[in-house]
Each structure stands twice: as C-alpha cells, then as structure tokens.
Amino acid sequence: MSLISMHGAWLSFSDAPLLDNAELHIEDNERVCLVGRNGAGKSTLMKILNREQGLDDGRIIYEQDLIVARLQQDPPRNVEGSVYDFVAEGIEEQAEYLKRYHDISRLVMNDPSEKNLNELAKVQEQLDHHNLWQLENRINEVLAQLGLDPNVALSSLSGGWLRKAALGRALVSNPRVLLLDEPTNHLDIETIDWLEGFLKTFNGTIIFISHDRSFIRNMATRIVDLDRGKLVTYPGNYDQYLLEKEEALRVEELQNAEFDRKLAQEEVWIRQGIKARRTRNEGRVRALKAMRRERGERREVMGTAKMQVEEASRSGKIVFEMEDVCYQVNGKQLVKDFSAQVLRGDKIALIGPNGCGKTTLLKLMLGQLQADSGRIHVGTKLEVAYFDQHRAELDPDKTVMDNLAEGKQEVMVNGKPRHVLGYLQDFLFHPKRAMTPVRALSGGERNRLLLARLFLKPSNLLILDEPTNDLDVETLELLEELIDSYQGTVLLVSHDRQFVDNTVTECWIFEGGGKIGRYVGGYHDARGQQEQYVALKQPAVKKTEEAAAAKAETVKRSSSKLSYKLQRELEQLPQLLEDLEAKLEALQTQVADASFFSQPHEQTQKVLADMAAAEQELEQAFERWEYLEALKNGG
C-alpha cells in the first residue's frame, strides 16, 4: 500500500484550477521531485500533502499513523528563543515541557541553588509522567547530527544555519515523509553539498520542490510534473524527464493542431447554405458543439519569457584593475592581497560561503567601500545595472504595473516607447496579473518583476547578486541565454552550480582568510583546477619536510658504512631535493594561475611536461636518498 494516495483531486482559487482531477501515489523510501512552472501550484500541493490545505473535491488516503513534516520555503525570521526551543516545537504539544527542562537545566549549571534544584525535580517528574525522555534524546541527537548549538539565539543565525534549524524542527517528529519546499534557497554551495549528503541518509520518503538542476539530478529518484492541473509521473532521472517531457509536448502540439483542423472543417460545414442545413446530421451538430466546448476549455502551455537587456554604449577595454587589495571588518580579513584585471566582455562568478565577502568585494570594486590598502582602478564609460533581490524595493501595496512604470502607460525599450502591459507580457505577466498587488505574487513572479525593471536600465556592466532564487527552470534557461548574448561585462554571485557553469568564463573562489583564487571556466572547471592545485602541492610539501629531516640526520650521524663517494652523494642529496622541490613548486604556481589555461596550447603543454619531468626527477632523487640512508645504517 502507498504511504499517500490522492484520487480525483480538484482545487481552484480562480478560473483555472490548480488541481484538475489529479492523481498521485507516494511510496516508501523514494525521493520525489515536484516540478512545474511558477504559479502552477507546487507549494499548495505540499500544503495539501501536509494536511494544511483541503481539496474542493477528491480524497487523500494516508497510511495509518503516518507522520509527515514540511520544511517551509522561507527560513524562519524574527523568531525569539534559542535553537533548542525552535527545534523542540516540531514535537508540538510536548514542546513546552522539553523547553522548560532545557532552560532550567542550563540555569542549574550556573546556579545550583535549592530553589532551582527543586524546580528541576518538578520538571523531571513531568517528563517522567508524560514519558518524554525519549523525545528529549531525539532532539539532542538531531541537534548533534546537524551541528547546531542548542543554546544559541535563533535570531543570531545566518540563512544557512536557519535552514538547518528549520530542518531539525521537521526531523524531530521522526517523519516517514519529509516535504521540502526549495530547500537550497539562500544556501551557499558548501551547505548545499552537505544537505545532499545528509538527505541521502534520511530513512524515509522525501518530496521536494527545487529549481536547482544540479540538486535535482543528484537527489531525485522520480519526477512528478504539475502542468495545468494534471500530475504526471516520470520514472528515472531528471535528464530522462526532460527528454520525455519535450516529446510529450511535441505530441500534444500535433494532437491540438489536428483537433483544430477538424474543428475548422466542421465550422465550415455548419455554415454551408440552405441545402446543407436541410440534410445535416443532428448528431454531427452535437459533436461540433462538444468540440467547441473542448476547445474553449483547453489550457495552453505557459509561454516563455522574452527578456532583453537594454545595452548602453561600450565601456572602456579595462573595466576594473585591482592590485594587492586588502579589506577587513572587525578583525576578520575578507579580502587579502587580491589582484585581478577585468576586461570588457568578461563574465565572472564570485563563489564562496555566505558571509565570506562576495558582496563586499563588489562594493569595493564599485567604490561603495574603501579598501584598507591596495589599488582599485575603475574603467571609463561604465553604465551599471545591479540586481540584488534582498535590497531591491518593491511596494507590496502597488500593482505590478505601477511598481514597474510608476503610473505611466509606456516604458522605453531600446530607445522606443512600449506599452507597459505589452512589456510585462514578455515577462509572463498577463494583463490581469499585471493589475495584481505585489504582495500577492509568488517568489518567482517577484523576481521576474525585478528583472523586468532592471532590464529597462541601459547598461554595459551587469551585476547579478543571487538572481536565480525562485525562478522556474524555463526562465532560468532564458536568463542564461540572455547573459550569453550580452555584449557587456557580467559579475555574478550565485550558488546555482549549473547556472554558473552555463554563464561564466572565470570563477573567483573565496578560499578563506581573505584569499581569493582565480580559475578559468565554470563552477566544475574551477573546482577541478582547485583540487588539482591542492593535490599537486601536498606531495611537494611532504618531500620538503622529509628532505629537511634527512639533511639534519646526515649531518648528525656518522657515515662509516659508506664509501667516500657515496657519503658525498648522500650529503648533497638533501640540498638537491630542496632545489628540485622549489623548481616543482614554481611550475605548480604557473599552472594554478587563472590565466594559465587561456595561453596557447603549445605553451601550456610545455609547462605541464616540465612539471611532470620535475615530479619524476624529485621522486628518483628521494628514492636514491632512502637507498643510501638504508645502506649507511646497515639496511
């Protein structure tokens, strides 16, 4: 029997139902990704599965005593109390006892007075009476598993830690089904990697909504597509779903075209002259009326946005030039000795954990902050368009149209006037939706409105700070195409690995302590170069340490068991090892430079060949030293 079965589900808040006679079956130990366009009803379906929202019609059957928990789309904000208090509330009615026990236990540790000890004894009796010790242990296990400090104030946590706390709150109820709505939103790449690993160890079923294509590929065992009120299951991985979905839409288009052709024929027949009307078949007339109804009820596939950037005249060739830039805040080094040159047309991603200094570096480059030391040169003729969903101001009480055009009927697009409603339709806002207050928009619609407003501004430098949150896959792909065709310079902050892969030519990775590594290519290219550089340095460091120890040992010990010639060779080997290691390290530094792989192929191959030869020479010298040492010691 399925854990959850939904039959004939119907739900509507407007003319077009969110669920139209939908069917869904959820099995044990699977990871189901729910996909669909913005506004299709995915989050509403999650609420239905979590018993927060009812159906207009249809039924849902749950396995007996099934526990379902939901991680909401937005992390908790402005919540008072400790992490323990927040997580414990996932157990609902027993939470108050457990929170009181946690608070009084901390109090006793600092003040073991008789009054506090008596209070602790009372609370312990309540836990005994309600048999809550097992729940207390479960909360502590979940907190330890997530690396959460139970005593920290929830309000002090960053977005990633808030997301972990919310996940802990969902997990303490020990659910068989875990519902995750956009779990990667606002998380940095390191935390997303951690989340993937953690969720793969979850003993139960996961149903999740995500527009992070890398996350979907790594997690999903089945795809469920919500499209125009219908739920369609696609077994297998995400790439297989994309192929099958494309084919299904192609077949639907052909079927609709054939239906429309037949309908047009019947309309011609019904409009024929008196002779035709005398002889016409009443059954055929009824069939025509049914066809008209079917055509009128058809829900068309949601269109694709038509984004277009308003490009300004070209900037100077050098957009930014930085030399030994340093910047720190409250003793924390965010940027240290960073040097780089950004040329016109470069597309660069800034990658690193939340709070590492990505936005700070952008502000330094734009002159909004002053560097502690170093030099930043800003190029000429720059026209900047800056997208930052966290700082962008939208009036929630004004309509979509008024937020964009401030009461005007036209906007200027590429130097030509265009009606506001027509421009908004390019961003998938139908005229009726354009009259809606912003507070009623979904996260994806809000971001589309911000992009629509941004792209009205002429620019030759596009700065995008987390532009992908809440956008559906189709809009993401269009934004990728837009960035690819943009003639100006792009600086991008994003935690969407595939989006970075598809849009940039260089990555700046924040590696800790203010160090920023520059690497050619997209995210996975950059990570590969970074790992290669680390792997190359480790053997060299080990050889240096061993050679230094060997040098000291050679001076210290006698050499009575070696001939004069071999003894001289042994004494000279430590210095040779140091020289070879220095040579290898110099070559490795060349390879690690961000511009290395952009050089002509012949040059890079020569350096790589020299590096391989130096590694072999170092290995042979080290083996010779080991042999002579063993010989000297009678080995």
Curated annotation (Swiss-Prot):
Its EC number is 3.6.1.-. Residues 563-631 form a coiled coil. Disruption phenotype: Increase in the frequency of precise transposon excision. No visible growth phenotype at 37 or 18 degrees Celsius. A double bipA-uup deletion does not grow at 18 degrees Celsius, i.e. the uup deletion exacerbates the bipA deletion. Deletion leads to an increase in DNA crossing over, DNA repeat deletion and DNA repeat expansion; double uup-radD deletion increases the phenotypes. Although single uup deleted cells replicate normally, they are filamentous and lack defined nucleoids, again exacerbated by a radD deletion. A double deletion with priB is disadvantageous to cells. ATP 2 binds at G352, P353, N354, G355, C356, G357, K358, T359. This is ATP-binding protein Uup. It catalyses: ATP + H2O = ADP + phosphate + H(+). It is found in: Cytoplasm. Keywords: ATP-binding, Coiled coil, Cytoplasm, DNA damage, DNA repair, DNA-binding, Hydrolase, Nucleotide-binding, Repeat. The keyword DNA-binding applies. Probably plays a role in ribosome assembly or function; overexpression suppresses cold-sensitive growth of a bipA deletion. May be involved in resolution of branched DNA intermediates that result from template switching in postreplication gaps. Binds DNA at Holliday junctions. May be involved in the correct segregation of nucleoids. Has ATPase activity, binds DNA non-sequence specifically; the presence of DNA does not change the ATPase activity. InterPro entries: AAA+_ATPase, ABC_tran_C, ABC_tran_Xtn, ABC_transporter-like_ATP-bd, ABC_transporter-like_CS, ABCF_ATPase, P-loop_NTPase, Uup. Residues 1-253, 320-546 form the ABC transporter domain. Belongs to the ABC transporter superfamily. ABCF family. Uup subfamily. Pfam families: ABC_tran, ABC_tran_CTD, ABC_tran_Xtn.
